[in-house]
Each structure stands twice: as C-alpha cells, then as structure tokens.
C-alpha cells in the first residue's frame, strides 16, 4: 500500500527468520529478462521488505533491520530470501535513521525508483549495501556502509525493468564506506 511510514523504535528489531520446510519468504516473481543480469537483480518479492509501484513510503528509525535468515548467495530455492529491502517502480521514498545488519545479497535494491532519499542509514553487511539501478532524483547523505566482500554503494543502469533505463540525478555526500569485518561497525569494534 502507498502512503506508509514504517517507524522502527529505539531497541526494536525487524528480524529476518530462516525459512523452514513449510514457511519462508515470498517466491521470486517470474522475470523473462533474467538472462541480462544475475538473479539478485531480477527479483524483488523474495526480500524481507519489498514494494512494487508504491508512492510516498518512509522507513525510519532508530531501530534495526536484521537480516539474520537472509542468504548472501544466489539461491533460487523457494522460500529463501536474499535482500533486506527491495523497491521497484516506486516514487517518493525516504529511508532514514535506521540500521541494517546482515542484509543478504543487498541491503537495498532500488530499481526504477523516482525521488529516493537515503539519510543517516547505517549498513553493516556481507554483500552490497545500496544498489541504485534505473533510478532518478536520488540523494544519499550521512550514511555509513560497511561491505567487506562486495560493493558499498552501487550506481548502475540495467535491464532490471525489462528495458534499459538510465540512473540519473544522483547526489552522494558525507558518507563513510568501509571493509571491516561484518557486524563490527555497528558494534563499534571495527575489526578486520
């Protein structure tokens, strides 16, 4: 639904569970264009939090989204989730003041999003922090992204929407990116 504000209070956690034999994440939706890129970039519904075609969405903190049960691998098994947040063809999205830990393949996969603000978000993960794909009017500011085994902030243009679309009008400012051990930035131990 559009016009949603998800507020994660101080000390609150949204925890991604491990799938079981009978329960799991939404299945990856069919996408005839998967041959143009890897599995993680071609599906949105197999995520802890996902939205398609939404407007006026805010997720804010200061709580934590903990992708404990998400995989960082290219799993195509039913019920396995591989992203913390996925947004496709959304407008007017604000993500601010919360933290993401162990996010699977991506902390955020934003594809075809117009008017996206990511402010003061902390990501401590083992793969990509923010993947900004086919988006326009994006502002990323005052964020911390620790991604020791992959990309911290990725800007790209792909066929994720089934057609090529540029990423345009992006501003990134006052961010800190690092490659410390997974989890050690949020717990302030800064280990390698």
PLM regions with names:
Residues 1-192:
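Extracellular/periplasmic carbohydrate-active domains that bind, remodel
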